[in-house]
Amino acid sequence: MNTARKLFYYNGGFLRQKRVRRILSMAGYELTLGLPDRGDMVAVWGQSPNQYRGQWIAKKRKAGLLRVEDAFLRSVQPGRAGDPPLGLILDRSGCHFDASYPCDLENILHHDPLKDTDLLCRAEQAIMRIRDNHISKYNAFETTQSPPAPGYVLVIDQTFGDAALRASGAGKAEFKAMLAAARREHPDANIIIKSHAETILGHRRGYFSAADATDTIRLLATPISPWQLFDGAIAVYTISSQMGFEAILAGHTPHVFGQPFYAGWGLSKDRKPTTGRTRILSRAQLFAAAMILYPIWYDPYRDRLCALEDVLDILEAQSRAWRDDHRGWVACGMRLWKRPHLQSIFGRSKRIIFQNNLAKAHHPDRRRVFAIAGLGCDAHPAFVIGGRPVGHLLRSARAQSIGTDDRRYSHPAPRPKSPRRAVAPTGHWGGINEI
């Protein structure tokens, strides 16, 4: 018997995004075209420009409204770069970034006791994992990059015309006022303006540009871990960026010029206070509500809804794989029948260049090199790859993973091997497909 609740939609994005459809289905909703009846639900994407169509139909037909958004930990790359989300926010009351009326998250923050010991312990442990492993909403950055010299003020840019900014009534004037306040309140400090991930990739423009740079103001428009930036900052300024929430997790009390979900709970310095938020919360309570109780998390490898901790496992592995692979690979000595399989594992960021001559493997854009074991690898700084299936008794089955070693092939071992590249820790899985 089908017990899924009908969820009507009038936005082509719900039709195109397979991952979103799957998460909604597992959460108990059946995406449907047509007109809803009383008691059905209508889906809209946050406060996107075409939300009004769904809002109007829901009101006219006396149906409920479900606002769908990406969860606060989304993926390695932004959605505009092609990565699907690892979780969704399904809110029946409002939008978490619009303080003009309560949303489900604000109701949790207002009314849930948030005193369960196990819940708060989970929150503290997850915060520690997120900080230690440099996990953020988007994760396409190196963790070995040198941050600016400490002692700066961090000012966070956002994408132009973002819905969260419209909800806070913020535009170009507010960003200029925020920068002016940072300069006025910290006259002796350098200022780092952090560009948004989508701005860095060229998908959307921000409010700041190179024209705002001076001798004491630097525009940081390269990918870098936000946790590295928090470590060296003496103050953090934001309108409503999620990095303001992450700054709280890093131990800062950010100056907030908008009205995001994390403002008003005693953890930020609010320049535009929200009415009605009078409760004082701890960092763990805010995190537990926003990251454990509020979102729907999804495991694309096991095709199931999951806990936050499972998503942290996935993002840790995917981020490590991206950091290994994003510059691309040159593969030497690979037989033709192996190449499609290797491409599916190591070629997700950039397609592999196959080369038969190891001496010609060096590439001008600093691609990394791996070679089949025994291809004269002892004298070459290449990764060594052995393509044995994990279940080697099933020799006719396609390999479910690839074992790699950056020192030597696994059979003759006159010097230490490096097992850190083996299978799961790198995220290099070939036979397990994401949904």
Question: Over which residues does each language-model region extend?
Answer:
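Catalytic-core helical/loop segments in enzymes performing group transfer/polymerization on anionic/lipid-linked
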Residues: 1-435
